Amino acid sequence: MATPINANELELQDKVVHINRVAKVVKGGRRFSFSALVVVGDGNGYVGVGLGKANEVPEAIRKGGDQAKKNLFKVPLVGTTIPHEVLGHFGAGWVLLKPAGEGTGVIAGGTVRAVLEAAGIRNVLTKCQGSRNPHNVLKATVAGLKRLRSADDAARARGKQAGELGGA
């Protein structure tokens, strides 16, 4: 099992991706509550996502940030991009992430962009298909990032040295 990541040791920036207002109809009218999708990252390979729910927006954002800090994980980076192409699925949505050359920038929609920038990825190409719901896109992006493997990890899994693997 991997060692847990201590959020207090990292300088995390948080970004609100989506705020949703939900109405519950009661005898006296409507009761509103809010949910907030929050992404936190240190811009250097660590990122986490969380969903907070509360009766007030600031409280929902705080709860989402706290949950995101509990869900931190490390993304392998190669310079300012990702090591290889990867596909992330969640529900009916999927996100394709492709490494890009220096100077390309983050070619992504708002939800995917927030996660990639929080992780410190500066050059990447993406494509979202299927569900465009922010919850599904966010979780599909995270699923894709969790599937990434560095060249060292791939070589170790095959019992070889990183230089022995083919490719770029």
UniProtKB/Swiss-Prot annotation:
GO terms for biological process: translation. Pfam families: Ribosomal_S5, Ribosomal_S5_C. Residues 12-75 form the S5 DRBM domain. Keywords: Ribonucleoprotein, Ribosomal protein, RNA-binding, rRNA-binding. Transmembrane segments: none annotated. One of its GO terms (cellular component) is small ribosomal subunit. InterPro entries: Ribosomal_Su5_D2-typ_SF (IPR020568), Ribosomal_uS5 (IPR000851), Ribosomal_uS5_bac-type (IPR005712), Ribosomal_uS5_C (IPR005324), Ribosomal_uS5_N (IPR013810), Ribosomal_uS5_N_CS (IPR018192), Ribsml_uS5_D2-typ_fold_subgr (IPR014721). SUPFAM superfamilies: dsRNA-binding domain-like, Ribosomal protein S5 domain 2-like. PROSITE patterns: RIBOSOMAL_S5, S5_DSRBD. GO terms for molecular function: rRNA binding; structural constituent of ribosome. It comes from the Bacteria. The keyword Ribonucleoprotein applies. The N-terminal domain interacts with the head of the 30S subunit; the C-terminal domain interacts with the body and contacts protein S4. The interaction surface between S4 and S5 is involved in control of translational fidelity. Part of the 30S ribosomal subunit. Contacts proteins S4 and S8. With S4 and S12 plays an important role in translational accuracy. Located at the back of the 30S subunit body where it stabilizes the conformation of the head with respect to the body. Belongs to the universal ribosomal protein uS5 family. This is Small ribosomal subunit protein uS5.
